[in-house]
Amino acid sequence: MKIVVPVMPQNIEEANQLDLTRIDSTDIIEWRADYLVKDDILTVAPAIFEKFSGHEVIFTLRTEKEGGNISLSNEDYLAIIRDIAALYQPDYIDFEYFSYRDVLEEMYDFSNLILSYHNFEETPENLMEVFSELTALAPRVVKIAVMPKNEQDVLDLMNYTRGFKTLNPNQEYVTMSMSKLGRISRLAADLIGSSWTFASLEQESAPGQISLADMRKIKEVLDAN
């Protein structure tokens, strides 16, 4: 499994102060641009992409509807994504499928989409249908993050991931059950067929994230012969 570390600067000064030495061995950087006001995103972008030019980068606008910090119309959401893609060619672009499904057809020319679904309230009863709908679209990555209310919710997320990966071996999945209760799903990513796990530098970008330092240690143990 690859380790993804989110960075969440709230202004250009914080972007410039990001310490590369702390994340040098990280596989992928996720830029959570929703920590900025809309008009600052393109201003901060050059600092981010220059600083992380040696890493794979995910561009993410996590909206309030899915646990983030920004509210955007369909038009603004698409415009920002297209501007960033044209100027900086991020390796991956997160697209909130269920929040912006009506405009997905305008993204069909993007081959690097992460079609994502985030539910910070529950693990929905129709989780299998969520997996099916996203898988049928065959994006670069299917990402699903849900909140468990009990142990069975965690096991359901893990079992569905394993099952869909077995049936669709060429599709990349990134899944997690959030909070402390769901933390095992982050550690068992390889086992269940999830390609990435997310780790935090300091501030969590989602409940239950493990620190990068701890995740490196755990990964060493899991990868040891």
Swiss-Prot record:
What Enzyme Commission number does this protein have? 4.2.1.10
Record's keyword terms, sorted: Amino-acid biosynthesis, Aromatic amino acid biosynthesis, Lyase, Schiff base
What InterPro entries does this protein's entry cite? Aldolase_TIM, DHquinase_I, Type-I_3-dehydroquinase
Q: Which parts form a coiled-coil structure per UniProt?
A: none
The Gene Ontology biological process terms listed for this entry are: 3,4-dihydroxybenzoate biosynthetic process; amino acid biosynthetic process; aromatic amino acid family biosynthetic process; chorismate biosynthetic process
Q: Any idea which residues are catalytic in this one?
A: 118, 143
Molecular function in Gene Ontology: 3-dehydroquinate dehydratase activity
- Hey, which pathway is this one from? Metabolic intermediate biosynthesis; chorismate biosynthesis; chorismate from D-erythrose 4-phosphate and phosphoenolpyruvate: step 3/7
Chain sites annotated for binding 3-dehydroquinate: 30-32, 62, 186, 205, 209
Q: How does it assemble?
A: Homodimer.
Into which family does the record put it?
Belongs to the type-I 3-dehydroquinase family.
Q: What does this protein do?
A: Involved in the third step of the chorismate pathway, which leads to the biosynthesis of aromatic amino acids. Catalyzes the cis-dehydration of 3-dehydroquinate (DHQ) and introduces the first double bond of the aromatic ring to yield 3-dehydroshikimate.
**This chain belongs to which protein, by name?**
3-dehydroquinate dehydratase
Organism in which the protein naturally occurs: Streptococcus mutans serotype c (strain ATCC 700610 / UA159)
